[in-house]
Structures are given as structure tokens and as C-alpha cells.
Amino acid sequence: MTDHIVTERGASRGEWDVLPASEVARETVRWVWPGRIPAGKLTVVEGDPATAKSTLVLDLAARVTTGAPWPDGEAPSQPASVLLLSAEDGWGDTIRPRLEAAGAELSRCLCVAARRVEGDEGSLLRPVVLPDDIAWIARLAESSNAALVVVDVLAAYLSDRVDSHKDQSVRRLLAQLGAAAARTGAAVVMVRHLNKAPGGPALYRGGGSIGIVGAARAAYAVLRDPDDPSHRLVATVKSNLAPEAPTWGYGLVEVPALGVARIEWDQSADPRSAAELLAGLGSSALGEAVAWLTEWRATHPGEVPAARLLSDAAEAGIPPTTLHRARKQLGIETRKRGEGWTVG
């Protein structure tokens, strides 16, 4: 690739590195989780406390270490190492048991607890700080062939020079982190909490500056299911490099021997979007849908094509997402039959 140097005219006479697009090498996006978590890029996972965000990302990390299939059926990749930065959970009493419950290959899970530095009093351990330690983390990722770096939670690792609520401050930091991800090829998953502001677009619900989700190439909200508080949903908030991935749900299954819970993924996608889940559907609309579906079921016993149900519901003014919630509440199942689906 040829470097073209264009000299800026003016008092500063600075220099820019410029090259024509014809000399830019075409590249294909690589994926850790195909269609959801791009390799060499930044991804955000956000949610309220107690939505099992950390358990979720450790489940994903475990799959990377073993090459296990992805929850939506996407093919696994070759097993690889992961770097784990966790500021809120204990390594021995929480993180290791969760990794074991998820079936991780523990030897490939590198727990980045602190950095050893030389000081006036000799060798010292100090907490990891961003952006100060980005180059060090990148070297660690390269030396261990890590495919995934988890930062849980992002805010806990920010230097006091970084204002997480100021766009420019955050973007400068994430530009460095994104460059390190691109250089190493590792996906960087940053976990953060949702803010407390009700409503509004899903893009603006994450804690801190909008620059965080702006710098990420993919972002997901981890939310409680409005119909079942014990059920969680992972909904796409942003997807720059692939079509928006469908919402996927999961439950938590206790593992008494380890004293933690593991993720149990749903077998199919959920039709609701992040915006719908965050805004919530009116209880009156759901109640009307439940009443309508109860009556419809009484007049349509046995297995009925799902297309018929959707058509009849549409004529009654019930959107598919509300119908889905009503069907779940009533325990009406769907089944694959040949080329289509049936209910009953």
C-alpha cells in the first residue's frame, strides 16, 4: 500500500496521511458470534442490576473457550482464550463458579485482576486503568491469542481523567480501545448499567455518554421479560455491521453444587424489539389480546396454522408482538409442521 502525504497549507503546515480508496485493502468482517459480536471491534452489553448481565457474558466467554455452538444455532469458532476484567464480582467465589457452571475451559480464561508495576518501593500491584493500560491489555491479548476481552463494568475501569458523561472524553478513550481491538483481532465486550430515565429510545438508555454506544459497532440490552420477571431477554440496540439480530431469551438455572446459576437459552427467537421491551406494552392492550385469544381458541380447537391466527388477530387489531405475549401468558405452544408452523 502506497502512502500519500498531503501537506496542509497554512501557518501550522501539519502533515496528513492520505491515500485513495482504490488503495485501501478490502476486508471481510470477522465474527466471534456471527451476526452479533464482531471480532476486532467494540460491543456494548447493558442492563439494569440483577438482570444477570455478568452471568450472560461469562456464558459467552465459556463458549469461546470451548468452541461450543452459539444459542441461536450459529456455528462455533475454534476454541480460544478470553481476558476477563471484572470489578464487581469475586474471582474465587463468583466468577470461577459461574465459568465452571457454563462449561468453560478454565485454562483459557485469563482473570486480569491487577497490573504489576515497578515503583519507588519495588514491584507493586495496582488496579487496571483505562486508557493507561490499553497497550498492556493489547499485548496480553496478543500473547495469549485471546478472541474476546470482557470489561465488566466499563465505568469501574475509567481513569479519573475520563468523564464518562462527556462525549469527547469518552470517544477519545474508546478510539484507543477500538484501535487496540482492531490490532489484536479480539472482540471487546463492554458491560454497563442502564440509566434510570424512563422511556426514550433504546440507544439513549445506557449509563454515561451516548459516545459509548456510538463508538461500539454492536450494542445489546439485557432486559427482564414484562410477562415473566424470571425470564430475561437480550435485544439488539445497535448493529452497524450486520442486519439487526432478533431478540433472544434465557432463564437462570441454579447449580447448587457451585452456589451459582447458569444460563439456559431459549430454543427460538422472541419477536419483540428493544424499543418495545423498554417502553412496555399497555396492560389493557395485553388484557384485550388475552381475552380475544381465549375466545378464538375456544372456536379453533386442535392444531391450527399459525398464519391463520396471525391473520385473524390482525383483523381484530392485535399486533404480532401483543399476540405473542398473550399466547405465552395462556401457555399456547407453537410447533413446526412441514414448511410452516401451527398453534395448539
Per-region residue spans from a language model:
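The Walker A/P-loop phosphate-binding site
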Residues: 3-106, 130
